[in-house]
């Protein structure tokens, strides 16, 4: 006997096809209600209703109020997907005046031996830490004068995020080791990438940030 499958098939109508195609052309899996309004030409209420239908059909996952992610078709009928957590962190931080820091930056620079359980982000604006689909996003409030020692890093083949450079990562870790798994983990990371570290830059950063551990 044939059983009814309660999960909806991931079919695309003309409007949803327009949205999906446009976002893919932009290499943009994460999107907001504002994006939907601009792409689909819908009013606010209609855009929200449209996105709700996409979530119900398994085409989109809601990450938080107003923030969504397209589900890759290769996931089949899976309906839960977050995408790359570093890109989610970038969007949560507003896309500017931020950088992935501490333990997350150590992971980006291959200074850890195992994946980090939380994503650490330093941002100028105060942000509340949150959990999305089991991943912790922890925000550290920074000052504008301390927004230096930052570089771009490829999160995927299409999208970059801002990450503290290796020397700034070490200094941040010495200043706040609790966000890196402890001072021992910072020391291990420094040893693992010792050939890439600039002693002169470490001292310069330490002076600017008033971190006496390096001195």
Predicted regions and their residues:
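Hydrophobic alpha-helical interaction segments
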Residues: 2, 151-215
């Amino acid at each position: 006997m044939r059983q009814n499958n309660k999960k909806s098939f991931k079919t695309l109508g003309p409007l949803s096809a327009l949205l999906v195609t446009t976002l893919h052309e932009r290499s943009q899996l994460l999107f907001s209600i504002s994006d939907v309004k601009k792409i689909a030409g819908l009013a606010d209420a209609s855009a929200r209703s449209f996105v709700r239908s996409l979530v119900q059909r398994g085409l989109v996952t809601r990450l938080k109020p107003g923030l969504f992610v397209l589900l890759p078709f290769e996931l089949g009928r899976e309906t839960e997907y977050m995408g790359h957590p570093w890109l989610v962190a970038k969007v949560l931080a507003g896309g500017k005046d931020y950088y992935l820091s501490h333990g997350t930056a150590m992971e980006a620079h291959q200074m850890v031996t195992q994946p980090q359980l939380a994503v650490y982000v330093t941002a100028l604006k105060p942000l509340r830490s949150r959990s999305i689909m089991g991943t912790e996003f922890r925000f550290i409030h920074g000052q504008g004068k301390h927004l230096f020692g930052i570089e771009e890093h490829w999160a995927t083949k299409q999208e970059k995020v801002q990450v503290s450079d290796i020397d700034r990562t070490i200094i941040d870790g010495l200043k706040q080791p609790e966000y890196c798994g402890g001072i021992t983990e910072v020391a291990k990371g420094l040893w693992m990438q010792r050939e890439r570290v600039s002693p002169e830059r470490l001292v310069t950063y330490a002076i600017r940030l008033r971190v006496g551990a390096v001195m």
